[in-house]
Amino acid sequence: MANRGPSYGLSREVQEKIEQKYDADLENKLVDWIILQCAEDIEHPPPGRAHFQKWLMDGTVLCKLINSLYPPGQEPIPKISESKMAFKQMEQISQFLKAAEIYGVRTTDIFQTVDLWEGKDMAAVQRTLMALGSVAVTKDDGCYRGEPSWFHRKAQQNRRGFSEEQLRQGQNVIGLQMGSNKGASQAGMTGYGMPRQIM
């Protein structure tokens, strides 16, 4: 964490709860997918939250990832710099976040730059990468590389269109219980709060 000291009291409890949401198994799956998706010579980071953060912190891996989800020549981030300057790295992270939102990741699934840069909420980073993978699998445009079962396929809109004639025919259907004194009834039911009468 950049210029922040240790947190105490309620802040410490909140930070511990956030840290408990981090999933080490999910980290391994995401690292494998990113390396496979980018298809470049990206080194495999050592396991652990701190190493995962350091691996993604400069933004180059994230920018390569989002570029690999587009056809060649249509990459959203044309220039990726491997700079050691903090502002350049944070700028690349924010470029990735904007490109991920344009790609189809919901705003509620996107982490904030400080979550990754300061390591405040690495679970949010994992959620964003999972959402990005889900959108990539759902699009099924040939740019996704990896096992399709690694991510959930998002539900697609499936609108039904009914003609006026079909809607009129639906009004003529008699409900199954109309005109019947059998089936569901309210016999024997009492109002809320009333005692049951046993005689």
From Swiss-Prot:
**Which residue intervals correspond to the Calponin-like repeats?**
174-199
Which species is the source of this protein? Bos taurus
The question of whether Phosphoprotein is a record keyword is answered with: yes
Tell me the CDD domains matching this sequence.
CH_TAGLN3 (cd21281)
Q: Where is this region: Disordered?
A: 178-199
Q: List the Pfam families.
A: Calponin, CH
Annotated keywords: Phosphoprotein
Write the signal peptide boundaries. none
Locate the compositionally biased regions of type Polar residues. 178-188
Q: Which residues form the Calponin-homology (CH) domain?
A: 24-136
For the biological process aspect of GO, one term held by this record is:
actin filament organization
Which family is it part of?
Belongs to the calponin family.
Q: Which SMART domains match?
A: CH
Listed GO molecular functions? actin filament binding
Q: What is any one of the record's Gene Ontology cellular component terms?
A: actin cytoskeleton
Task: Give the sites modified to Phosphoserine.
Answer: S163
Q: What is this protein called?
A: Transgelin-3
What superkingdom does the record give?
Eukaryota
